[in-house]
Amino acid sequence: MSKRAYFGTDGIRGQANKHPMTAEVALRVGLAAGKLFRSQDERRHLVVIGKDTRLSGYMIEPALVAGLTSVGLDVRLFGPLPTPAVAMMTRSMRADLGIMISASHNSFADNGIKLFGPDGYKLSDAQELGIEALMDQGLQEGLAAPRELGRVKRIDDAQARYVEIVKATFPRHLNLSGLRIVIDCANGAAYKVAPTALYELGAEVITLGVSPDGTNINEECGSTHPEAMAKMVREYRADIGIALDGDADRLVICDEKGVVVDGDQIMAIIAAASHKAGTLKGGGVVATVMSNLGLERQLNTMGLSLERTAVGDRYVMQRMREGGFNVGGEQSGHLILSDFSTTGDGLIAALQVLAVMVETDKPMSALGRQFEPVPQLLENVRFVGGKPLEAAAVKEAIADGEAQLNGAGRIVVRASGTEPLIRIMAEGDDPALVKKVVKSIASAVKAA
């Protein structure tokens, strides 16, 4: 089996109570994962589960638990916890599998299931396909005997454990005393842990998006709506604003003037500081095809390279592991610092930026513009069915655009892994030409 029926680029994701994000599919994931582990050896296996604050988490979590325990796996429940924390706890608790129930930056109506291996890394494509192969078996197959059913326990101090891990990534000789920080937790998984970590490191903390009600996650707040954070930074005259997304694996920052700093600039800040300190590994940074050409040029001036991958933090992490890199990420704010974490961690990345601020005694406005971005335009075109990228007219429009840019820019056209969208991105030194190229390709996609 090579074609994915359930898993996309970031686990299983969709609208709650619609295929594939139903209680039945969650039950089948639990059953299939359990059967896969039991087929490998007969010992007791342990699975840990975390979730964000979506209402549908109350439906998905017990369905997963039912599937796992019915085939004899033990389960530990964390409750609301960031995705990177679940990855860390999977490893520290010697679990065989970690599961995060979240649709990240999507609205509350969506949910998702992400799987982590015992090393804290996202499962490989082959491992996910192995689970998929067992998901369509009958629900009565391979069940455990009554005495062999799994047991379930809640871990009450999971949030406190993660706070301590996060604080340990901040240099011991520094603290955040004297800094006024706005933190927007998107009414999501970090609503307790992020303000706590910043406060315990000495900051004056002003909170936003810390009142989840099950339906307000990412709603006009968080990393996808940084204007809320920026407004509060200006109002309270804060030194910096930090916005996380619903599962806290994504980070956007703004400076003391409310100017937003994206993932590319944050990578440049951390890479430059690490390079200066002699701690940058791999001779550069790993990012995706969507990262700005300006980042690549900036790194080149320091004698560093930018390695590009397909879109998706799993592919960034994969390249980082292959090449021995320790800084990578996406323009959208997924930032992976592999010295500290096995996946994107917004809070840890924010602390490393704060460390640079404190160490250099510079305001965020002096750090946030590491390079001048090359004009870049992104347009999303929704499609109903078919494969528009295979249409001859679309291929012709892309080739024509590349010819017009003539090596002084880039074009990336791809299908979203999580939504029925074609994402069209072009960048180059001539903004008018970039706009013309994007509009031409978008028109071809719409007509396909």
UniProtKB/Swiss-Prot annotation:
Superkingdom, natural source: Bacteria
Entry's EC annotation: 5.4.2.10
Keyword Cytoplasm included in the entry's annotation: no
Modification note: Activated by phosphorylation.
Pfam family, one: PGM_PMM_II
Reactions the enzyme catalyzes: alpha-D-glucosamine 1-phosphate = D-glucosamine 6-phosphate
Record flagged with keyword Calcium: no
NCBIfam families reported for this sequence: glmM, PRK10887.1
Protein name: Phosphoglucosamine mutase
Species of provenance: Caulobacter vibrioides (strain NA1000 / CB15N) (Caulobacter crescentus)
